[in-house]
Amino acid sequence: MKPGRITHAIALLLSSISSLFAHPAPSKTEPAKAKFNKKSDKLSEGLSLDPISFSPRNFLAPSESGQRYPWKKSIVTTVFWIGEQPSGNNPVPNRASSWDKNWTKNYGGFDDPNPAHRSNYIPVKFTPRQNPFYCALPYSDKATTGHRPEAPRVVPWFKEAYQGPAVSTCKGRWVAIHKGNRTVYAQWEDAGPFRTDHWQYVFGNDRPKPNLNKGAGLDVSPAVRDSLGMNPTDVTDWRFVEFSEVPRGPWSTLGENNTFVINDRKKGAALAEAAKPSGGPIVR
């Protein structure tokens, strides 16, 4: 027998012996396919979200950029002002706000929107006593007494901001407003336009409801208008921001309600207190 044939015979013999001791391989089973409901990743159109079952964490999950509050994109935005009189598309006067019945008085007067009567984002006739960078969103957490029943669940910061039944947890909250290549920061000081109950939009994923102003979902002050270069009716993006995210700018200089002004006064008072003599006995 030739060497090649001997090698081949030995290989066949070894293969036969090993097959006697081999365990049969288990049959390969296909993994079970998960069953998905096509509606599982979105809300059913007929689903009604009641305040008890609603959890804001489902709606205000961090965006791709890691922000706690995602941007509301392409929102019709209109201009309003403190002291505004009723008109065809604005049936409610703005002498008072949802949270301040003496809004015009506390602001210091009529926030004249006429650009010819304004300079450096404020009226030329007086210096406002409140932040001229303000806005309105169509929700108020306050009821006639106390807060709306859904407020503790739908307002993401309700627990940390709660100061008792008479105080709004929404008033004064900072909002970033973006148009083009500009971003302006304003404080939430009123509820509107038109509605005060649309938490599904303000804190959720709904779009603004139809209204007399082309479905507007945000009102901004003349100062915000001028800083962004807005038209009377325009389109912007907006989102809530933590105060720590707000940079200094024209929105940080004025107002007894302004977080920057309040903090600066506290720092000044603390420094003045620290600079006082200790009052102890003088060592000679």
Can you describe what each PLM-predicted range is?
Residues 9-19:
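Bacterial N-terminal signal peptides
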Residues 23-284:
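Secreted/periplasmic proteins
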Residues 2-7:
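Bacterial N-terminal signal peptides that target proteins for export
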